[in-house]
Amino acid sequence: MSQEKQVFSIDLAGRQLTIETSQLAKQANGAVLVRYGDTAVLSTATASKEPKNVDFFPLTVNYEERLYAVGKIPGGFIKREGRPSEKAILASRLIDRPIRPLFADGFRNEVQVVSIVMSVDQDCSSEMAAMLGSSLALSISDIPFEGPIAGATVGRINGEFVINPTVEQQEQSDMHLVVAGTKDAINMVEAGADQVPEETMLEAIMFGHDEIKRLIAFQEEIVQAVGKEKTAVKLYEVDADLNQAVREMAETDMHSAIQVHEKHAREDAISVVKKRVIEHYEAEEADADTLGQVSEILYKIVKEEVRRLITVEKIRPDGRKGDEIRPLASEVGILSRTHGSGLFTRGQTQALSICTLGALGDVQILDGLGVEESKRFMHHYNFPSFSVGETRPMRGPGRREIGHGALGERALEPVLPSEKDFPYTVRLVSEVLESNGSTSQASICGSTLAMMDAGVPLKAPVAGIAMGLVKSGEHYTILTDIQGMEDHLGDMDFKVAGTAKGVTALQMDIKIDGLSREILEEALQQAKVGRMHILNHMLSVIAEPRIELSAYAPKIITMAINPDKIRDVIGPSGKQINKIIEETGVKIDIEQDGTVFISSINQEMNEKAKKIIEDIVREVQVGEIYLGKVKRVEKFGAFVELFSGKDGLVHISELALERVGKVEDVVKIGDEISVKVIEIDKQGRVNLSRKVLLKEEQEKEAAKEEAAKEENAQEQQ
């Protein structure tokens, strides 16, 4: 292989994509620098020389953001990047999922794929560059990877599909679809959409796959030019004699145990068989390696039998039909002091979702590589160990929890009211209380119930369902509402969320090489039937969002002021706005266009704050009449407060109709008097007159007297 830098280029969505090899990170097994527009991502792949003594494939994928990529210096005291952002974690998962199925069963060498984002052009996706770079780094390396794969982002504008849309195009698009796969089939889908029909989503997936084929052909050319010969590795295999002996000892009893319908009873029955076999080999003083192989064989017996029952006999572990959904139960308003709550139960999967409404100042501030600076809608997913009857340390959210939370967020965001119609920050927290598969979709259903209970005026309710697939040769079975065992031992986890009108989110992970269009189409249609069944159940519990918000939710008043007056409301160093907040206990958020949001639980305090702000921004107009209060008396006149923060001077000559010798003869401090604005000078000083109003009143009285005289004269005639 040549050690000189080599450059390969292709056009991708009207922008140049360039791959540079053999210059950077040469000690990694494989490394490429991907340039897409002005985006630059360094992707590397490294593998251990020897297999690890573990019973799984130790693959780690890292998508590393560097703030220098967008010309930022990290905040905080340390001034360096800390833990990965949510976006970086989701990007790592996005790359991991299509790559993982393409390593051989039994491969136990540790593999680490790292993509460092070094420069960002917002119109050229760094995630797509990293996915391509990760695939290519593995493909040109000596690591036995059965790729390459590629990914593409698909948008839809005015009914037309667009590959890798720009930021401006994304704002106009009614879907954001990421699809990845090999040249033969799709193996990963991640999508958010604005209630798009299933048929359209399928067309978008296939449209993206056409672009994937082109990118894979491009990668194959690069591999042909600079790729290393793949290392021959020994795959993990169990001893053939041991395999036969264990199967003879355990298969019959294990097959019976698998068909126990209830989850915990089934797990106990399987454990009894496993324990008996392992104790037999422990009694024979088998070493750790042999005992590990025995566990592996027992696992394979379970997997093979579950798959055979589903594909051949069409029997699921819990006795359901392929398209049957577990029993449903829902409840709302179960937590009195929260703003909204929804409990959703599907079989032995249960999620309790809580909705909290906050002011717009409660938005989440984003400090990453994207153009978004904040978001007003959040969905957080928690998966405590007690939900599966286990014990483990309680730590912060892992990649899985962050991924499931983001999926729910993506599914629900399209049906949220606009900020103009509902000026609240919305936070959802989904607590998984029981788990037997499909918890992410249960959290979506629970969150819909919680928002409806909270009075959030959703455009439409959303439900989610997880589909599964078990494929053996030409035989396959698509499963509706998969449980934990079917997810773990099956070939697909296909989550579909949406309304009665269409899809709002998709997520698909495949453990086999990929799926055909026909299977995808069948899965989508079967998911729609299941989703509608769940939606109907949810609507029987709460048919529409509550009209009134919770008494414990903040009340928000919206008002508009002249943008030039924003500085007056805020005051020097925030002095004025902080004074209002301290006096009323409200939260105040001001937009650049002059929109003001005032929020608190106490509506009376909201109104008080609004009145204060109205007085601050109110402008004095020549000719207007005010009832003001005398604040100060001088020899030359009286200063009158027209409203909060606005004073004017009534000169001594303008106090009365007659000549006034002393101001105190007419008014004193604290008196309320009516005055008229007669002038605002160049310095902004307001000159007032009481005399003008007295004269006008005198003239009105004179006019009344004259009219009365004329009326009397007419009567006498």
Swiss-Prot record:
Residues 623-691 form the S1 motif domain. Its EC number is 2.7.7.8. Its main location: cytoplasm. Mg(2+) binds at residues 487, 493. One of its GO terms (cellular component) is cytosol. GO terms for molecular function: 3'-5'-RNA exonuclease activity; magnesium ion binding; polyribonucleotide nucleotidyltransferase activity; RNA binding. Its cofactor is Mg(2+). GO terms for biological process: mRNA catabolic process; RNA processing. Gene3D superfamilies: GHMP Kinase, N-terminal domain, K Homology domain, type 1, Nucleic acid-binding proteins. Pfam families: KH_1, PNPase, RNase_PH, RNase_PH_C, S1. It comes from the Bacteria. The keyword Amino-acid biosynthesis does not apply. Residues 554-613 form the KH domain. It is found in: Cytoplasm. It catalyses: RNA(n+1) + phosphate = RNA(n) + a ribonucleoside 5'-diphosphate. Disulfide bonds: none annotated. Keywords: Cytoplasm, Magnesium, Metal-binding, Nucleotidyltransferase, RNA-binding, Transferase. Involved in mRNA degradation. Catalyzes the phosphorolysis of single-stranded polyribonucleotides processively in the 3'- to 5'-direction. Belongs to the polyribonucleotide nucleotidyltransferase family. PANTHER family: POLYRIBONUCLEOTIDE NUCLEOTIDYLTRANSFERASE, POLYRIBONUCLEOTIDE NUCLEOTIDYLTRANSFERASE 1, MITOCHONDRIAL. This is Polyribonucleotide nucleotidyltransferase. It comes from Bacillus mycoides (strain KBAB4) (Bacillus weihenstephanensis).
